[in-house]
């Protein structure tokens, strides 16, 4: 059996090369486009965070919501996830805490590592990328439970994330950045 990192390398590379992801990394997203991305992240984190995380500092939903409020000027915010995000969220809601751990590994470590570079490239202050506490302990909380057997499920998580990035890019191209943020709750 391949180590987890090697087993997901191909799809991880594909996700990194998605047009929307590249535009985000290059600092090319408008406030509206990034806000729409954050809305998708909030829906995903809300679904994952119904279960206890390996470390309390991993909680992202609150930080993402702060970023959304900052970029939209606060007030009442209605968040409508994209079709691809709803599919992922529905899938996550079928999983037990143990079954969700590969999704924690993928979604949270991505923000902890790649997000540190991304923070300076995105609109707003990037609270989603800020973790309170010792980063080594926080990362260690995931690494301590990490299993190579997670490869299939982590690849499935990458498939969902690739679909979300693809839908974000298609929406971006068709609407020139109008968002599905009405103004929070997730619909």
Model-derived features with residue positions:
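Metal- and O2-centered redox machinery and metal/ROS homeostasis
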Residues: 1-187
């Amino acid at each position: 059996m391949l180590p987890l990192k090697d087993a997901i390398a191909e799809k991880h590379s594909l996700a990194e090369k998605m047009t929307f992801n590249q535009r985000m990394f290059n600092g090319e997203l408008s406030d509206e486009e990034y806000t729409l991305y954050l809305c998708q992240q909030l829906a995903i984190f809300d679904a994952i965070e119904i279960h206890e995380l390996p470390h309390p500092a991993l909680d992202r939903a609150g930080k993402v919501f702060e970023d959304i409020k900052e970029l939209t000027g606060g007030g009442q915010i209605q968040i409508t996830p994209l079709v691809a995000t709803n599919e992922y969220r529905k899938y996550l809601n079928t999983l037990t805490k143990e079954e969700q751990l590969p999704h924690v590994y993928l979604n949270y470590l991505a923000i902890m590592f790649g997000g540190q570079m991304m923070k300076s490239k995105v609109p707003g202050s990037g609270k989603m990328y800020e973790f309170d506490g010792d980063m080594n302990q926080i990362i260690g909380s995931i690494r301590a439970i990490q299993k190579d057997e997670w490869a299939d499920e982590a690849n499935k998580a990458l498939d969902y994330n690739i679909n979300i990035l693809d839908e974000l890019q298609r929406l971006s191209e068709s609407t020139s950045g109008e968002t599905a943020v009405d103004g929070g709750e997730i619909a």
